[in-house]
Amino acid sequence: MAETQPLVFVLMSISAILTAGLPINDDASLLISVNPETQQLVDSLGRERFFHGTNVVVKHKPYHPSVEGYDNTSFSEVDMKILQDLGLNTIRLGMMLPGYVPTRGNYNETYLKIIQEIVSKAAKYGIYTLLDMHQDVMSAKFCVEGFPDWAVNTGNADNFPFPLEDKYPLNLQTGYPYPKDCAKHAWGDYYFTEAAAAAFQNFYNNTDGLLDAWADFWKKTAQGFKDYKSVIGYELINEPFAGDIYRDPSLMIPGVADERNLAPAYDVIHKAIRTVDEQHSIFFEGVTWDYFAAGFSKVPGGDAYRNRSVLSYHYYEPPDFNKKFQFEVRMEDLRRLKCGGFLTELLTVGDTAKDMSDMLELFDICDQHKQSWMGWLYKSYGCYKQHLGCLTDSMHDETGHLRDIVLQNTTRTYPQAVAGHTIGYKFDRITKKFDLSFVVTADCRSTESIVYFNKDLHYSNGYDVTVFPKDSVTWKQVEKKIIINHSQKLSAGTTVTFSLVAK
């Protein structure tokens, strides 16, 4: 486990962030796409880009964080400065269906403007945004959240939560089950109710035009963000369920629902998005139990869109069970589909020794496979207390301060941009040693690589740098980044190495 600093140091660090006003950069000004041959995210200069980030998801009204001040409801410029200081250069921001389309066909343009404001401000701090249509078990009708009532069609399955229990009584004022009844089961169990399964199937089947409405939501969203280069992509849906597993039990077989239900639906949404936005990447996700391989045979839209497609995946234990094996499976998915990959959720806020061990092991595995990640969750925004699909609380304690355990272990030394093809990188959380190696490529139009490092936390006694080839590589420190420049005279295929060692 990484060595810890006194909590007073943590609080002083937060205080300094809140008052100092970190320099603003334009790192989020370059459009991100995918190199299908390497399956790496790249910017418009041809540099490979790597992201560490967090989730900012508000699952209840008003479906967005407050944009002013600093408290448990905010994601303001104060919060953005904190993330920038920690080296977190991306957020997964809830772009919520009930927030934007509260009633069918009626779009809340005020909501869109607030999300646009958050995206624009975050970009000033070098933070890219993934827009995520987040949901957990679809609806408050099923004790959780995600879809407005108009988008939930259970057909004849009105016996929720059967087969977990007999039908719950409904609150006549809200039309939803009572919270005390919902609390009888873990929220994830409600996916496997007959009513929720039927509602997902009706959504995929375009019953009552619901798939068309989903596509319209994304078309309108893409129209609003097509010119925002700091949008890293559109995530079509969070943790989609398989569909009606009671009518078709084979949907429970890993990969089957991806092929039968999700892939056709994603193609419909892709087509709608591409009528207004040909640039941004689409993030697509399989069911949560794709243990052996995702069931997709192609990316949404087909092979021509491999360079704008990213397979989004999560890792939690349970339901996942073997980190090394399942990452190998995901990497094989990326090689097969020739698309990018992104771990868009992992637990970064757990309190147990196992939570900590799992998180640190996942970070190391992500480095090994050159994968970007986003932790769950920056702030709870009330979702834990409201039984809205949160496994645990957030990066913040009840007073609004960043928790010591989070600060120590999510701010890691890593490359944010590499001017070539990355061979590998590694951060040793005990010794703080960091190594990076990459190959100069002919198609990269930049010689500048960027490494984030938290000097105050990890290198407070100073550091030493070693580069190779010595006569062709220079470096300089700019705040909490090291800028590495290699000579334009280096030929393609030349290996460049960089090492950072704490004194």
Curated annotation (Swiss-Prot):
Intracellular or extracellular location(s):
Secreted; Nematocyst
Q: How does activity depend on pH?
A: Optimum pH 3.0. Highly stable at acidic pH.
Q: Which residues does UniProt mark as catalytic?
A: E239
Sites carrying a glycan are N72, N108, N205, N307, N409, N485
Keywords, comma-separated and alphabetical: Carbohydrate metabolism, Cellulose degradation, Glycoprotein, Glycosidase, Hydrolase, Nematocyst, Polysaccharide degradation, Secreted, Signal
The leader peptide range reads 1-21
Which Pfam families does this one have?
A: Cellulase, Glyco_hydro_5_C
How is this protein annotated for GO cellular component?
extracellular region; nematocyst
Name the catalysed reactions: an oligoglycosyl-(1->4)-beta-D-glucosyl-(1<->1)-ceramide + H2O = an oligoglycosyl-(1->4)-D-glucose + an N-acyl-sphingoid base
Q: What is its EC number?
A: 3.2.1.123
Q: Name one GO biological process term.
A: lipid catabolic process
Name the InterPro entries for this protein: GH5_C (IPR041036), Glyco_hydro_5 (IPR001547), Glyco_hydro_5_CS (IPR018087), Glyco_hydro_b (IPR013780), Glycoside_hydrolase_SF (IPR017853), Glycosphingolipid_Hydrolases (IPR052066)
Q: Which PANTHER family match?
A: ENDOGLYCOCERAMIDASE, PTHR31308
- Which protein is depicted? Endoglycoceramidase
Protein's organism: Cyanea nozakii
